[in-house]
From Swiss-Prot:
Substrate binds at D296, N500, Y660. In the N-terminal section; belongs to the enoyl-CoA hydratase/isomerase family. Residues 311-716 are annotated as: 3-hydroxyacyl-CoA dehydrogenase. It catalyses: a (3S)-3-hydroxyacyl-CoA + NAD(+) = a 3-oxoacyl-CoA + NADH + H(+); a (3S)-3-hydroxyacyl-CoA = a (2E)-enoyl-CoA + H2O; a 4-saturated-(3S)-3-hydroxyacyl-CoA = a (3E)-enoyl-CoA + H2O; (3S)-3-hydroxybutanoyl-CoA = (3R)-3-hydroxybutanoyl-CoA. Keywords: Fatty acid metabolism, Isomerase, Lipid degradation, Lipid metabolism, Lyase, Multifunctional enzyme, NAD, Oxidoreductase. Residues 1-189 are annotated as: Enoyl-CoA hydratase/isomerase. It comes from Shewanella sp. (strain MR-7). Its EC number is 4.2.1.17, 5.1.2.3, 5.3.3.8, 1.1.1.35. The lineage of its organism: Bacteria, Pseudomonadati, Pseudomonadota, Gammaproteobacteria, Alteromonadales. The active site is at H450. It holds the Pfam family 3HCDH_N. This is Fatty acid oxidation complex subunit alpha. It comes from the Bacteria. The record marks E119, E139 as: Important for catalytic activity.
Length: 716
């Protein structure tokens, strides 16, 4: 053994080829400070051996290296620029040391080689992947750029255009795609991986492969004619900005770094990368996006822990077909859990099966599935007009019409047909789980399971704990949601649960602006373009449906009359009473039609303005700051109330619920990250300016105390 540490082992194989194996404790390899230090020491040990002729990098795990240890980032990025620069330079010195070894090097890549893992393989002369490999630089998704030489080496290996696509999108690349552009030199079967890498090194030692020319090219300026370079980078900037927009600076910074470094050798090019990396690491956007990644890990960790308590869900059932039932059935069946779809009407079953078939056909058309896989998924969905096939289900999801009496009747019925230990969940968006539980003989096996529409696209599922729900029930539904490919958060029962409870105060703020003559299209523009929501409030209400919004608003007003009660008609009432239901009937705040390509088209509708003018008088202009304040303050305060009341367990889970359930702008990180970035004291001062507007604008005592102590909701 040449070198050994808890994360890396180096041994000498036949023909004087050394093998460096990444094999950290735990399930995956990642670049934390300990592993970087071990790699540095391992390379020093290798350099001291006079007989080594080549080096192969391997992994003792199912994956190569998943990337840097992101849990270290927020603490590290909070350091002074000088400390951060020192860390980046020391890390890069290790990768340079690997690249400068006086003999050929190769990486044998299996599973993920992402971020720092990808930058490791780029520092070697040859790269051989097996068929399980996924290679990529996802750093821009975290608001930063690669910091271990990725922006320097990748363009010199696969060309600037290909490298910019990899870096700015942050997507994982399949081995065959990596081979096409030259990121890897061969793709082999998993069992042949190490032997293929060693053979390539033997060929390099025997001078059949020119490893020195390859290395020289990686360390030199890019070979791009000046005019071609100018055109390439100008085009890239336009394309990248069109996708990333002004709120996500990292992709544009990556283009700029690659462009500036194009004419430089390795040392100067790396300095350009270092400076851009540090600048981005200090941004609020990076903090927010890294925070989302860490929050996602926390939520997934909780779901994994729940799996230990959970009942194994081998089969499921959904009661109520149609679009929602069909979406749930599709999601369950496509992720491998067979499901019975039960309804009282054949046309509804046909609609549900049609919805599943439509989603699957779209996947086949895009090349993401095959007709054989489509048939298998559809065979996993069993339509039924009676309860007989439901009796074998481990979990039953009730998804009938959103009416308490109808739901209570269906829940009482199904309980008679299912097994004693079957779990029953209601896909309700507003009706109290404790209220529905009263219709059941065994309320301990009942909880809420709130999917968001469209089911196949929306990642969040709210699992609602009623006062009688057992831990096994909650754990089993969390595990089932995870198995369906969803991100579950557990919330306690209250009107609107978590997501709708915090959404409707936002709509109330919007209604307040319209009641004073605000222009809904102007408000949407501010909330989309400046705050960063995917849809402004008027457009979102049209998509949700004004009938749904009207009903949910009444539920919230009844549940929280002091804050959400109404004294008269608002804009939602005006639209609903005039049968303007939104996209579903082609007219809401906006008018909807289909363009020449068959795609939905949204237009401002003069009729909406006439109706609002008749109800609320002449239009009045509001500036962007006031629009943002009056819509967001109620949502933020209600989110804080949910945390204080224990409706949601942590700031992390609340923020993930907002990002995944409502599309809260990821670059802002969620309500609690937004509050910490703004400063709780600054927010309290802003809210106090609008406190005269009512209870929704009045901060809690605990918020005021936190502000007085200069506190924050996150520790980092």
């Amino acid at each position: 053994m040449i070198y050994q540490s808890p994360t890396i082992q180096v041994e000498l194989l036949e023909d004087n080829i050394a093998k460096l194996c990444f094999n950290a404790p735990g399930s995956v390899n990642k670049f934390d400070r300990e592993t970087l230090a071990s790699l540095d020491a391992a390379l020093d040990s290798i350099k001291q051996q006079s007989n080594i002729q080549a080096l192969v990098l391997t992994s003792g795990k199912d994956t190569f290296i998943v990337g840097a240890d992101i849990t270290e980032f927020l603490g590290l990025f909070a350091q002074d620029d000088a400390v951060l620069l020192s860390w980046v330079e020391q890390a890069n010195a290790v990768f340079n040391k690997l690249e400068d070894l006086p003999f050929p090097t190769a990486s044998a890549i299996k599973g993920f080689a992402l971020g720092g893992g990808c930058e490791t393989i780029l520092a070697t002369d040859f790269r051989i992947a097996d068929t399980t490999a996924k290679i990529g630089l996802p750093e821009t998704k975290l608001g930063i750029i690669p910091g271990f030489g990725g922006t320097v080496r990748l363009p010199r290996v696969i060309g600037a255009d290909n490298a910019l696509e990899w870096i700015t999108t942050g997507k994982d690349q399949r081995p065959e795609d990596a081979l096409k552009v030259g990121a890897v030199d061969a793709v082999v079967a998993p069992e042949a991986l190490e032997a293929a890498a060693i053979q390539m090194l033997k060929d390099a030692v025997a001078e059949k492969l020119d490893w020195q020319a390859r290395r020289h090219r990686k360390m030199s300026p890019l070979t791009l004619p000046k005019l071609e370079a100018m055109m390439s980078f100008t085009t890239a900037k336009g394309m990248v900005f069109a996708v990333a927009g002004k709120h996500y600076p990292a992709p544009m910074a990556a283009v700029s770094v690659v462009e500036q470094a194009a004419t430089k050798g390795r040392s100067d090019a790396l300095q350009i990368e270092h400076q851009a990396f540090i600048k981005l690491a200090k941004t609020d956007v990076a903090k927010a996006l890294i925070g989302i990644f860490l929050n996602d890990q926390l939520v997934k960790g909780k779901a994994k822990k729940a799996g230990k308590l959970a009942k194994d869900v081998k089969s499921a059932a959904v009661l109520g077909a149609g679009i929602m039932g069909g979406g749930i059935a599709y999601q369950s069946a496509s992720k491998g859990t067979p499901i019975v779809m039960k309804d009282i009407a054949q046309p509804a079953l046909d609609l549900g099966l049609g919805e599943a078939a439509k989603l699957l056909s779209a996947q086949v058309a895009r090349g993401r599935s095959t007709p054989e896989k489509m048939a298998k998924v559809l065979n996993n969905i069993t339509p039924a007009l009676d309860y007989a096939p439901v009796n074998h289900a481990d979990v039953v999801v009730e998804a009938v019409v959103e009416h308490p009496k109808v739901k209570a009747q269906v829940l009482a019925e199904v309980e008679q047909y299912v097994s004693e230990d079957a779990i029953i969940a209601s896909n309700t968006s507003t009706i109290s789980i404790n209220l529905l539980a009263k219709s059941m003989k065994k309320p301990e096996r009942f909880c809420g399971m709130h999917f968001f529409n469209p089911v196949h696209k929306m990642p969040l599922v709210e699992v609602i704990r009623g006062e009688h729900s057992s831990e096994e029930t909650i754990a089993s539904v969390v595990a089932y949601a995870s198995k369906m490919g969803k991100t579950p958060i557990v919330v306690n029962d209250c009107p609107g649960f978590f997501v709708n409870r915090v959404l409707f105060p936002y709509f109330a703020g919007f209604n307040g602006l319209l009641a004073e003559g605000g222009d809904f299209a102007a408000i949407d523009k501010v909330m989309e373009k400046q705050f960063g929501w995917p849809m402004g409030p008027a457009y979102l209400l049209d998509v949700v449906g004004l009938d749904t919004g009207h009903h949910a608003q009444a539920v919230m007003a009844e549940g929280f009359p002091d804050r959400m009660g109404k004294s008269g008609n608002d804009a939602i009432d005006v639209m609903f009473e005039n049968k303007r239901l939104g996209q579903k009937n082609g007219k809401g705040f906006y008018a909807y039609s289909v363009d020449s390509r068959g795609k939905p088209k949204k237009d401002v509708d003069p009729t909406s303005y006439e109706l609002l003018k008749a109800a609320f008088g002449e239009q009045k202009a509001f500036d962007a700051d006031e629009i943002i304040a009056r819509t967001m303050i109620p949502m933020i305060i209600e989110t804080v109330r949910c945390l204080e009341e224990g409706i949601v367990a942590s700031p992390a889970e609340a923020d993930m619920g907002l990002v995944y359930g409502l599309g809260f702008p990821p670059f802002r990180g969620g309500v609690f990250r937004y509050l910490d970035t703004m400063g709780v004291a600054n927010f309290v001062a802003l809210a106090d300016k609008y406190a005269h507007l009512g209870g929704l604008y009045q901060v809690t005592d605990a918020m005021r105390a936190l502000a007085a102590n200069n506190g924050s909701y996150y520790q980092a």
